Regions:
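NAD(P)-dependent short-chain dehydrogenase/reductase
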Residues: 126-128, 154-207
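N-terminal Rossmann-like NAD(P)+-binding domain of SDR-like oxidoreductases, especially those catalyzing
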Residues: 1-172
């Protein structure tokens, strides 16, 4: 199959691309390298340096490549930035996703797999390990955007028959992760430990 991976130069996306190529799939990457790294791009994949916000270029790529499945990882990743500039966050994370969904609809893509959020979707739900049945109550524009896209995907499935899988990742860590990023506490701690640096905890105690 031919699979398009948005955000395929990023930490998670590039690892998915490598696995798909190992499984003998044809892979197309769309990434504007805002947070991705060209060094992560598998040379056996076809690479387009394009933003998901560029509707015309996205449409052209889908028409040209005849995609079977889309794995959508491209996003504005910073929760704090989403609070500081919610309009920009919505432009990338909601409108960008809609550009992908429209291209899927118009070119008869079989399925979309969406990278949602396992932390920000639930807000302060009080559960140690919320599952899919837990109440979604996002408290940041980033979380609101991710949940909104989940609903858009379900709507496109109901309206146009687009199959989907939604993955709510939480505290993902692994190869190629930026240990200096604002997210990814496991990678940050591992990075500090391997560099023999102190790990600082900020603790709030309510009595």
């Amino acid at each position: 199959m031919k699979i398009l991976v948005t955000g395929g130069a990023g930490f998670i996306g590039s690892n998915i691309v490598d696995e798909l190529i190992d499984k003998k799939h044809k892979v197309v990457i769309v990434d504007n390298l805002a947070t991705g790294n060209i060094k992560n791009v598998n040379k056996k994949a076809k690479f387009y340096k394009v933003s998901v916000c560029d509707k015309k270029k996205i449409d052209d790529i889908f028409k040209k490549e005849k995609i079977d499945i889309v794995i959508h990882h491209a996003a504005q990743l910073d929760v704090r930035k989403s609070v500081a500039d919610p309009c920009f966050d919505a432009d990338v994370n909601i409108k960008g996703a809609l550009n992908i969904l429209e291209a899927c609809k118009n070119t008869k893509v079989k399925k979309i797999i969406f990278s949602s959020s396992g932390g920000t979707i639930y807000g302060e739900c009080g559960l140690k390990a919320p599952d899919e049945k837990a109440f979604a109550n996002p408290l940041s524009p980033y979380g609101v955007a991710k949940l909104s896209v989940e609903h858009y995907i379900k709507a496109y499935s109901a309206l146009y028959g687009l199959k989907y899988t939604i993955l709510r990742y939480g505290n993902v860590y692994g190869p190629r992760q930026d240990v200096n990023g604002e997210a990814g506490v496991v990678a940050i701690f591992i990075g500090k430990m391997t560099a023999n640096k102190d790990i600082l905890f900020s603790v709030t105690v309510n009595s």
